[in-house]
Regions:
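Conserved glycine-rich beta-strand-loop-beta hairpin in the small C-terminal domain of fold type I
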Residues: 279-283
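N-terminal Rossmann-like NAD(P) cofactor-binding subdomain of oxidoreductases
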Residues: 16-230, 266-267
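Short hydrophobic/aromatic beta-strand micro-patches
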Residues: 286-288
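Oxyanion-binding "anion nests"
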Residues: 227-278
Length: 288
């Protein structure tokens, strides 16, 4: 999961920055959206690389509260305000007061929740590392991929944005080429897995595939997470269509690439397609 991995790397980059400024030993981290696919992926990808002894509160909306997260590094972890049972932590319901005493808040909750709680996080003195699209194009919010523009972490005003997954894997490949010779144009086609649509999308792929193989017709299949049947199909429609008939996913790749690379003159043409694969986005990139 490129978004979870990148959020983790931004987290570590921020930890290094806070430590270099004399932050206390043992930073407190809060993970908002712990019970969802993005938050859970972020939890797994961090492994034991988080500074030992740091608190790791798991926070979620009302639906996810009470969910078990699992032991961290194979050990029980005593976390402030959380119940640590045999084999795991219990997720708490998130509220504005959840971020008191937290240094870094990892958000994987969706844009609406991130916008709603931004003020509470920053007022508590924490740094929000946000996995949603809420702040990516805000001028005062750095959009960071550590392998590409790690220095941008330094100018945050309390929020650091994590790019779209399809943008992340592309700019990581573009950066060393750009360092050799400035890039003029990029044509990219993406083949994006169901995981990009979250747990409901993956469940729908599984269910539809099973139903299709059992002989059900298109009319009998349940279609809710995608615009069309995803089983044995490719859908060139990720997010909503815009006025120029491109999709918002394609627009994200264009504008995010320019911001991350620090070059508004790069021309980017993107075609984004959802494919019937559980995990693993693929891209074909032509670079001039």
């Amino acid at each position: 999961d490129f978004c979870s991995i990148t959020a983790t790397r931004v987290f570590l980059q921020t930890v290094r920055g806070l430590c270099s400024k004399g932050a206390k030993n043992g930073l407190d981290e809060g993970n908002a959206g712990e019970s969802g696919g993005g938050g859970g992926g972020s939890y797994r990808s961090r492994g034991q690389r988080v500074p030992e002894g740091a608190a790791r509160p798991g926070l979620s909306g009302e639906r996810g509260a009470g969910a078990g997260v699992g032991a961290f590094g194979g050990q029980e972890v005593a976390v402030r305000g959380l119940r640590a049972g045999a084999g795991g932590l219990t997720v708490q319901e998130m509220c504005p007061e959840s971020f008191e005493g937290v240094d870094i808040a990892l958000f994987s909750c969706g844009a609406g929740v991130s916008k709603e709680l931004r003020e509470a996080v920053t007022a508590a003195g924490a740094v929000m590392i946000d996995n949603s699209s809420a702040f990516r194009m805000d001028e005062d919010v750095p959009l960071v991929v550590p392998e590409v523009n790690p220095g941008d972490v330094a100018w945050h005003n309390g929020v650091i944005a994590n790019p779209n997954c399809s943008t992340i894997q592309m700019v990581v490949a573009l950066k060393p080429l750009y360092d050799l010779s400035r890039i003029k144009r990029v044509v990219v086609s993406t083949y994006q897995a169901a995981s990009g649509g979250g747990a409901p999308a993956m469940a729908e792929l599984y269910d539809q595939t099973k139903e299709f193989l059992d002989g059900k017709s298109d009319d009998e299949l349940t279609v809710s997470a995608f615009q069309h049947r995803i089983a044995f199909n490719c859908i060139p429609h990720i997010d909503k269509f815009l006025e120029d008939d491109s999709t918002k996913e394609e627009w994200k790749m264009v504008v995010e690439t320019k911001k991350i690379m620090g070059d508004q003159d790069i021309r980017v043409a993107a075609t984004c397609v959802r494919v019937p694969v559980y995990y693993g986005h693929s891209e074909s990139i032509n670079v001039e």
